[in-house]
Amino acid sequence: MMKKYIKSITVLLVILFSVSSVSAATLTQRLADGHKLRLGFGTAVPWAYAGDNGEALGFVNMIALTVLEEMGITEHETKVFEWSGLIPGINADRSDMITGGMYILKSRCENINFSDPIGVFGDAMLVPKGNPKGINNYADVIRTGATLVTGTGFNTVEAAKKFGVPDSQMLLVEGEVGILAAMKAGRADAAVQTFFGAKEHEEKTGGAFEVTDPKLMPKETVNVVGIGFRKSDNEFREAFNAALAKV
């Protein structure tokens, strides 16, 4: 009986050690061992989103896949998260790359590393057609006492606070879907998001909402976008950057 017990414990320890070893391996090592690369992103049209069959769509995913192909990597899996779960997800080993169209911010660099920039983008306000309250930037939100909606974990949360929008005027929801739902329901007077995200909502609603001129936003709201990696995967990140420079 004791021998059987010891054997069971030994098998369990071997399994646990194997799992922890896989988790501790770098992305470069994993791919060499035959594991598929896992792309992590949210639902943020046109940046990154999953198609009907789970395929990675959106222009940031297309850039990432083109670079990976340059590296000789043609197989991957998709992992869809809420935006606020992207960084916790990659650090919990649930994905290998963040391809959601994430701005490179100091606060994010404390938890992950980024590729070289893939583009420069700005934010804008989404408002009801005709912009009845005249909201074009954070100062207008404060001046009018408007309720401003944005996504949990979005760069715009930090930006709104930086420019003085009080918590009492902020509504935080999950992702792009939550933002549009809040605007449709009249729970907010304006939404702040990336210009491309706002344009997508404008088009999706048939003109019920409009996008303000991003040039009326503070210049500090223009940011660069990169692909996110675990800090332990710097070797792979450097190889990705080298391939990015070629495409």
Model-derived regions: residue spans:
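Extracytoplasmic small-molecule ligand-binding "clamshell" domains
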Residues: A25-G101, E110
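Short loop->beta-strand "edge-of-pocket" segments that line small-molecule binding or catalytic clefts
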Residues: H35-T43, L57, Y138-G153
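Small-molecule pocket liners
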Residues: L37, V45, V120-M125, N131, ...
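Ligand-binding cleft/hinge of the Venus flytrap
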Residues: A50-D52, A64-T74, Y138-A139, F154-E174, ...
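Extended ligand-binding regions for polar small-molecule ligands
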Residues: G58-E70, N131, A139, F154, ...
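Acidic, polar ligand-binding/catalytic clefts
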Residues: L65, H76-D140, L216-P218
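A ligand-binding cleft/hinge motif common to bilobed small-molecule-binding domains
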Residues: G85, G101-E110, E158-K162, D189-T221
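Periplasmic-binding protein-like
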Residues: V120-A124, F195, E203-L244
